[in-house]
Amino acid sequence: MKTLNTRTGLAAMSVALMLALSACGGGAQAAGESSETTSSAPVATASASASAASTPTATKASASASVVAEPKGSEVVEVRAADDTNADATIAKQAAIKAAKRVVAQDNRLLNAWLHGDFEHTSDEELLKFVAPEKLKQVTDPIQSARNDIKNNGGVFTGNVTIRDVAVTDIFTYDYPDGTSYPYSVLRVKFCEDWTQLRTPDGERAVTGPDSTATVEVSVLRLQDGRYVYNGSRELGTGCASS
């Protein structure tokens, strides 16, 4: 029985997963951050095509309408803040933080769905609810890798990749190509990613050794239409402080 490509391929899928949208340098300016510290390395950036859209205010009402209750498996939902995040206010900051954590939670749910063989909601149209348009290929490639791993291993994986200790470590204001900007529009989210419960079809651990846990940082971007999308990730190191 072949094991999946260990963390180099599988976890790369999570840390690459829908992933991967290279690091954000560009128009991000520090606006505020949580009590946790983080590396000074850049996070992912969104180009003009990612943010070129209508710019409705992300109000509480519109946010509530856009959130699907308890999405399952590979279902992709738009993530919007539960309060208006256009203003530079504490309530807006907290709403943005919660939205960023929901993006990370959806990323994890989709990863597990694909590893379990659920590819129902992987059309370009559906994936674009969650990923910037110019990053689509960096999402579809890992999905194909999951399909290949399942085929090569003779079946789907069981168990789940889990995450814990999720915390927003940095928040920035993003300057969009048209000259507009919104506070709390780029957020870095750090967490522990744990692969110890994932099993191959024959019941063996899919990932073993020190690579079975990792500290990961995800960048989340607020698009001009109010959506918060997965905007890249990187592995900060193997193992987790809490492990």
Where are these regions (language model features)?
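Structured, amphipathic secondary-structure segments that form assembly/contact surfaces
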Residues: 121-243
